[in-house]
């Protein structure tokens, strides 16, 4: 009942919040202008931008240049961190390959962590590098999504200014909400301090170092920005990051807030096309929510069912291996599905200890990479499937392929297919390399089916810019650091460039009014068709390897 109530509340909250996002996205005046405008203008002066509207090509150039500069600075700071200030725990520099992976991971909103937060990064890098990139990577994804929506919906005839979009989103959305969430988490016991680790003597007489630091400030944007990288190695399974059931709900709600609001924002932007087309966003929301609930139900069933091998020994009950007692199997499964559906990557239990079908659920969500998804880019990925569904359905019934009164031609379809293929190609090719290269396969700690699942989960998490992992895998090696770094880089920027190209190409075409010769995108059957094509296309791509991994493991448990 608490899960149903929580999900219902989040749907209502995100619908209301989308109204505020609409004003931010369209640079409309609001009551908070007096508070934020001066700070925004100061940021614009520091950046040196004149706020002129950019072309799509210029927008992408500035997006890539901004991200490239941040990535370089991050890499340098990580390899010299031991000589900088705010290092009371005397942490050493990261290796070149680990710094490469870490910089790309946080730059791309993935937060795949091949390091231990307690022992491999200083307070300075936690705040200046990790926390800063959590803001900017999230805002970058939002900015390019809004640019795409402006073009597709025809709400304005401009794509916008990249720096204006990113600054407004950080100042008016991320910073205020992060401060609020940080305070809420501190009231629940999450630490916020710059003191060195505590050194205590245990009851057995041994010395133990207890790691903490500025956790609350990182924890808030970690979930709000769908980042996922933990201050501590145990992530949100540790009491310092996620002390109780209330902090657990705060963190889950933070993950869901902005990606769900983006779909409602899309609906508000479609309002110029009339009430009928406005319902299109609702159809998309219901379709994605249906897949979300289906995967959640499957995961919870598997986790509550437990391990059949233990049941044969007379030990019944849910699968509690790798889980925190304060959350139990239900809230652990919910957190797992939310963190992979919204591509956050934060964990409150160990995914490597999930049952085979329990691990299949989050893996499938990352392979689909469209069920709400991360900040901005999740909606962009969904729209690619929408365009693909419109095109296929139109050809099947002999109608004209068009979307929002814009015809879909050969040029757009080439880009759409390329965006669709990038994701599985990166996952499957690099997974094959991991099994072929001896040094890489030595990182697998489990034999047979589960070892395949470990590799597939790692590569899928990197390609989906998620960041969670089956942490039994020994991933801090040169191969895993470089390979996953390349995957995160390519899977982030190539689709974004192509998606903006698609939007610009569509809007430059001659539009015409919807008639009987076009597919109605506001009808329930379109939502059903979308679900079928998402499952069918992704199923054909990944079902062979899933049979070798989690499904094969499930069939061996008797």
From Swiss-Prot:
Location(s) in or outside the cell: Cell membrane
Keyword terms: Cell membrane, Ion transport, Membrane, Potassium, Potassium transport, Transmembrane, Transmembrane helix, Transport
Protein's name according to its UniProt entry: Potassium-transporting ATPase potassium-binding subunit 1
InterPro entries, per the entry: KdpA (IPR004623)
Keyword Kinase among record annotations: no
Ranges in coiled-coil conformation: none
GO molecular function, one term: potassium ion binding
PANTHER family from the UniProt entry: POTASSIUM-TRANSPORTING ATPASE A CHAIN, POTASSIUM-TRANSPORTING ATPASE POTASSIUM-BINDING SUBUNIT
Oligomeric form and interacting partners: The system is composed of three essential subunits: KdpA, KdpB and KdpC.
Chief place where the protein resides: membrane
Gene: kdpA1
Alphabetical list of NCBIfam families matching this protein: kdpA
Transmembrane segment boundaries: 1-21, 66-86, 127-147, 166-186, 245-265, 281-301, 327-347, 354-374, 377-397, 416-436, 482-502, 531-551
Family recorded in the similarity comment: Belongs to the KdpA family.
Source species, domain of life: Bacteria
Job of this protein: Part of the high-affinity ATP-driven potassium transport (or Kdp) system, which catalyzes the hydrolysis of ATP coupled with the electrogenic transport of potassium into the cytoplasm. This subunit binds the extracellular potassium ions and delivers the ions to the membrane domain of KdpB through an intramembrane tunnel.
Keyword ATP-binding: no
UniProt xrefs under Pfam families: KdpA (PF03814)
Membrane topology: Multi-pass membrane protein
Gene Ontology CC: one annotated term: plasma membrane
